[in-house]
Structure formats: C-alpha cells, structure tokens
From Swiss-Prot:
GO BP term, example: tRNA pseudouridine synthesis
Residues annotated as catalytic: 52 (nucleophile)
Listed GO MF terms: RNA binding; tRNA pseudouridine(38-40) synthase activity
Top EC class for this record: isomerase
Subunit structure: Homodimer.
Plastid listed as a keyword: no
Natural source organism: Bartonella quintana (strain Toulouse)
Reaction catalyzed: uridine(38/39/40) in tRNA = pseudouridine(38/39/40) in tRNA
Pfam families for the chain: PseudoU_synth_1
Function noted in UniProt: Formation of pseudouridine at positions 38, 39 and 40 in the anticodon stem and loop of transfer RNAs.
Binding positions for substrate per the UniProt entry: 113
Name of the protein: tRNA pseudouridine synthase A
Record has tRNA processing as a keyword: yes
Amino acid sequence: MPRFKLTLEYDGSNYAGWQRQAELHTIQSALEQAIFHFSGQQLTTTTAGRTDAGVHATGQVAHVDFIKNWQTYTVRDALNAYLQKQGEEIAVLNVQNVPDNFDARFSAIKRHYLFKILNRLSPPALNIKRVWWIPKPLNVDAMHQAAQKLVGQHDFTTFRSAHCQAKSPIRTLERLDVYREGEEIFLYAQARSFLHHQIRSFAGSLMEVGIGRWTAQDLEAALHAKDRKRCGMVAPPSGLYLTQVDY
C-alpha cells in the first residue's frame, strides 16, 4: 500500500487534542474523516506528535497508507477542500510519497516547538487562544540564561506530567532559547522527543524567573530535585506550537 507523508497546520483551540477519542472532536478524527470522504476507506493516521487540547501546529507530520497510488497534489487538494467545507481549522500544507518503512513518529530525529507569550499590560483581543498573556514585565535575558541550565541530558521528572506515559524521564534537550520580538516573547525548544507537558512546564517555570521570583539556581535546583512539586505552574496550551519535525 502506498504510504503518504502529510504536513499539517492547525489551530488546536477548538479540538480535544490530536488523538482520536470517542465522542470528542479531535484533529485525528477530523483528518481521518476527510480521508474517508476522499478515498472511501477507513484509514488510520500516525503522527509525529500527539498534541494536547488547545495546542497548535504549523509543521505537524502524519502518515497514512492508501490502497491507490494517488497523485500527491490530488490528495492535498481533496483533503483541504473537505476540511474547509466542514469548517475545520486544519490545513494540509504538503503531501509526499514516502517509503514503506517511513514512520511519522518513530522515524523522527528532531522535533521543534515554539511557545508564544504576549507580554504587555493590555490583554489580547485577536489571538487570545494563540498566546499566553502575561501582563507583568518579564526579564528575557534572565529567562534565557536560566533556560541554559535545562539544556543537555537530564532526568526531567520535575518537568513532566504525573500522567506522562513515557518509560523514562531522561531526555536530551538540544536547545532552549528565549528571545523577545516587540511585545512577544518566544521560547524555542528542540529535541528528539519531549515528555508530556515538558515544554509547558518549562514555560511556567521560566516565567517565575522572568518576574524575579526564581533565580537560575532555583530552576537548576528544581531540575535536580526530580520532584514534580518543585515545578512552576504549567503554562496554558494556547501558547504552544509544534513547528517542525526532522527526519
């Protein structure tokens, strides 16, 4: 069966996450319904990242096996037409033929995420579901310097959800940059894989540094404590974007 790689963009605000769930509106169920409408087949998609409810993507990747070897542009255009007609906030950006051994999840060698903070006194009127609004002034330089304490291979128990299903809390964080562009602050994270709520936990803890409540040493101590209770607040999903997956 021909395997196709789909690159996706979506606003996750009105979805109960990626993963198909009974009686809930999810990205996977909406995409697979579009695939069924196009092909007449009940097919299952596999994704690089099972994003949570409210999390967005500008470069999510999934794969699906069709029985027929369609033209890639035909797949893209047909799926987009159906998704748009249904009022879904999902777009298929690109479709590629890939070998049978390509796996959107397990073939990935790097995942890139961006977390957006709106740092101003006035609340957002347009992008309220696409940023984390923090009215208190944030010290971006302090946040970036503290973030470097998290880079490298560590036991990230402090920064993962209590419901995380990963067998090991050890991950290698390749980059964690914090920078400002006008009123927006961005956290850029890069690793082969991440734990459940890891980036949102980073964002919430770095906010504590930004407002001056924590120092870089406090963040480092929280990391080494390997204790979920030592984490700062978990930032809301609205600011998180899966931007790219490398293979």
